[in-house]
Amino acid sequence: MSALPAWLRVEARSYSEMAKVRSVLSRLGVYTVCEGARCPNVFRCWGEGTATFMILGEVCTRACRFCSVRTGNPRGYVDLDEPRRVAEAVRRLGLRYVVVTSVDRDDLPDGGAFQYASAIREIRRLAPGALVEVLTPDFRGSREAVETVAEAGPDVFAHNVETVRRLTPLVRDRRASYETSLRVLKTAKEVGCRLTKSGIMLGLGESFDEVVEVLDDLRKAEVDIVTIGQYVRPTKSARHLPVARWVPLEEFQKLGEVALSMGFKAVASAPLVRSSYRAEDLYEMALGLRPRAVLV
């Protein structure tokens, strides 16, 4: 596949807000997926005083073929002070909207659900004005784990299907499944989460109709918010799948419009869109606080 199209190139910038965020995170020993997963929007988000925190360590028990996070066995270790430090970072940075995500932790009986709940509660305690979105793993489909997170009261519960049904065995770790992801999202609604959210990457070999099928499945699971972005290979390692194609801007726009017509409350669809892209704007749109439109 050829080099990145012009619309996927992001100018590297460094300014005072970036330095402030890095300094706070370093002193508190907390991590962000913004840098760990090489997100192209890190400059925009940090520049706006927004960050996506990664809890439960930096080692994932799964090896999805789109992700740059390190794979290994954390052997059950959990830093119980981590939720407090994340909340303290939120307080010091004065964040309005916080996304909390994590690696997969198949080595833990609850998949890390308790740590998510603790992080939500600590943020509520130390930064009561902040809105909290969680982007969770699939917890191996455990209803109890989803309930644990939901009971802590996140403003948005997110879990990504990542790709179309046909490509799931190729793209995601063998322990993940398309059906399990849909079940997690449906369960989140059933146990009281007001807003649910999911995301999909394009450029892995899917067809337009397959993406529409995913959108239909997500609506059947009562998902409110959807993000659609371009897959970019994180490294040239054999582990990471090559890009099958660079999806044109027009196709993103068309899929976004299809999603809105299906009844999603908020949609972001563009090459640079990632799970947490303009998360606060999507939240406000889902609540009817801003006009419904495809965010790009």
Curated annotation (Swiss-Prot):
Record-linked Pfam families: Radical_SAM
SMART domains recorded: Elp3
Compartment(s) where it occurs, according to its Swiss-Prot or TrEMBL record: Cytoplasm
Cofactor: [4Fe-4S] cluster
One GO term describing the cellular component: cytoplasm
Catalytic EC class: transferase
Protein name: Lipoyl synthase
Organism expressing this protein natively: Pyrobaculum arsenaticum (strain DSM 13514 / JCM 11321 / PZ6)
